[in-house]
Amino acid sequence: NVAANLATCFGLNTAIASAMADYPIGRRIEAAVRKAGVTAYYQRFPFDGVRGPNMAIVWSDRGQGVRGPTVFYNRSNEAAGRLKPGSFDWKAIFAKKVRWFHSGGIFSALSPTTPALVIEAMEAAKKAGAVVSFDLNYRAKLWAVAAAEQGLSSAQAEEGAAKTLRNIVSHVDVLVGNEEDLQKGLGLKGPEAESKGKLDPTAFFGMIGQVTKDFPNIKAVATTLREVHSTNRHSWSAVLWLDGKNYTAPTCELDVYDRVGGGDGFAAGLFYGLLSGKSPEESLKLGWAHGALLTTTPGDTSMASLDQVEAFAKGGSARIQR
């Protein structure tokens, strides 16, 4: 999602390294990646005609009114779970002047081999001089299923997830994650001061000291803030800690069409701003604006233009453009 957003909305050259199963669903996904303008480096796997390996299939009910959105998926025998260190020639990939490498907690939870692959890629990125970012995206279901396959309990799953993610985050420059991600994903304690509400940044900023104490390599931490009034009505903001300073985006009221992908939209806008040499405030607002606009259209990737994002970041409105 982040790579597609940066390509389609922000006009950057992007690429992904992933798995591809050679069967019709895989070819459909491959075509969509090409259409988004994203270069792909695939480790290909033959499909056996019956059981896979498969491409993950995700269903989303965007909800309406009092019916909340629901996301469920089938990741059985997923091709990406077969990826491991050595699956990609990182030296060749990063030789193409890559400036930023991004990964996340969902991919890291797919199998026992994917975390080591993430770290291998991060180490190669560092050697090439690229910025390394990571979205914690803590998903209890994914970690629980992976642990259950090894005969572990849910408590052991959470402990194992924190151990794995802490190892990965020790290689990261820019971290994306909210208070729950930081607590469950990294095993950090919550702040003593209670948050006044979903949009109050106190809880988030209150945890930064723990983050930087445990991970002195971290230069920036960011997340969105969202208060849900109904499925289609949200209050929306975002926060950024960068080089010791706190930044908070404005709060706006969103009429939401499809909330899935808003977080990736925020990350893409933030990364674009930082890559483009924008100020921390401008970068945060670009992420905030792009994430907001993404929730107004179906799907989890952007249909917005850079002009629209910049206008909204500067205080644009929903007045008709003629």
What do these predicted ranges mean?
Residues 1-13, 35, 273-276:
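Alpha-helix C-terminal capping segments
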Residues 7-8, 34, 119, 123-127, ...:
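Anion (oxyanion) recognition and catalysis
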Residues 11, 127-131, 215-219:
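A short helix->loop->beta-strand "cap" motif at the edges of active sites that frequently abuts
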Residues 13-105, 148-149, 310-322:
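Conserved N-terminal subdomain of the carbohydrate kinase-like
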Residues 88, 115-120, 155-163:
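Charged helix-capping and loop-helix junction motifs
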Residues 231, 250-316:
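Conserved post-catalytic alpha-helical subdomain immediately downstream of the catalytic base
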